[in-house]
């Protein structure tokens, strides 16, 4: 297992700050857009920004000529699904029916999911008692800071139970997405990040249009929230996420979710 560097810790803190604002950005975007449309717009904007940067910097996307290339594209596709399309859509929809506190605590579950996944799938992160104890203490600390009542607040929405499940499934997707990124063969961080976002947008587009239709021109606050989501918690955050996972591992990266609810 790679020991995290100071640069890794700085990147982790920055990622936590950026992702922490994503719930507010989503709340603003949902004023005018449906949850699937918000997910599509943030991923599409982020993919366009990173594609321009990738091309301008001369970085190349992997081809399809070798088994390794095809394996890389498989991981990129899974990244688009597990790290972008599915969790963004589920969290956006869930936020319509659950308290923000519950959504935040759900993200704090991710490290507890990644630890056993890393142990059994990657074989490089041993699930020693010290780590288990540390991750559990971190989770309990988040609940105490936010307030245990946030877990049982009933908003009165008939779809709230399903929304809670959606938030939990989103957390599981983030955990699996981290493992998937770690398993990917060596590839440019920009190419991997950009490719995952492009595929995520392609997969989201028909679903969002079929379910929610063509969106109307939004209110200014919703537009600002959507642009913020695309540029920072998606474009910039994806680069940081992939970089941290590749250099320090998914278990270390998952600790960012202890910052997000705060």
Question: For each of these PLM feature ranges, what is it?
Answer:
Residues 13-21, 25, 53, 74-97, ...:
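Hydrophobic alpha-helical transmembrane segments of multi-pass membrane transport proteins
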Residues 16-19, 43-47, 111-112, 135-138, ...:
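Residue-level recognition of pore/gate-forming positions within transmembrane alpha-helices
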Residues 12, 69-78, 126-139, 187-197, ...:
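Cytoplasmic-side transmembrane-helix entry/capping segments in multi-pass membrane proteins
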Residues 21, 25-28, 32, 46-68, ...:
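Membrane-interface helix-cap regions at the ends of transmembrane helices
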């Amino acid at each position: 297992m790679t020991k995290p560097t100071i640069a890794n810790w700085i990147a982790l803190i920055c990622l936590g700050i950026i992702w922490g604002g994503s719930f507010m950005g989503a709340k603003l975007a949902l004023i005018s857009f449906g949850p699937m449309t918000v997910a599509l717009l943030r991923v599409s904007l982020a993919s366009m920004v990173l594609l321009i940067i990738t091309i301008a910097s001369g970085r190349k996307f992997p081809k399809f000529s070798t088994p390794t290339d095809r394996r890389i594209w498989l991981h990129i596709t899974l990244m688009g699904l597990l790290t972008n399309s599915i969790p963004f859509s589920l969290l956006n929809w869930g936020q319509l029916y659950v308290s923000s506190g519950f959504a935040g605590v759900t993200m704090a579950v991710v490290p507890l999911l990644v630890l056993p996944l890393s142990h059994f799938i990657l074989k490089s992160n041993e699930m020693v008692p010290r780590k288990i104890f540390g991750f559990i203490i971190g989770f309990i600390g988040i609940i105490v800071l936010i307030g245990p009542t946030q877990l049982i607040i009933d908003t009165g929405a008939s779809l709230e139970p399903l929304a809670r499940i959606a938030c939990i499934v989103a957390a599981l997707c983030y955990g699996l997405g981290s493992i998937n990124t770690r398993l990917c063969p060596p590839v440019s961080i920009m190419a991997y990040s950009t490719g995952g976002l492009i595929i995520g947008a392609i997969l989201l587009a028909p679903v969002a249009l079929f379910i929610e239709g063509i969106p109307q021109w939004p209110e200014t606050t919703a537009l600002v929230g959507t642009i913020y989501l695309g540029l920072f918690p998606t474009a910039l955050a994806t680069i940081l996420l992939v970089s941290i996972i590749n250099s320090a591992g998914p278990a270390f990266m998952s600790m960012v979710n202890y910052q997000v609810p705060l």
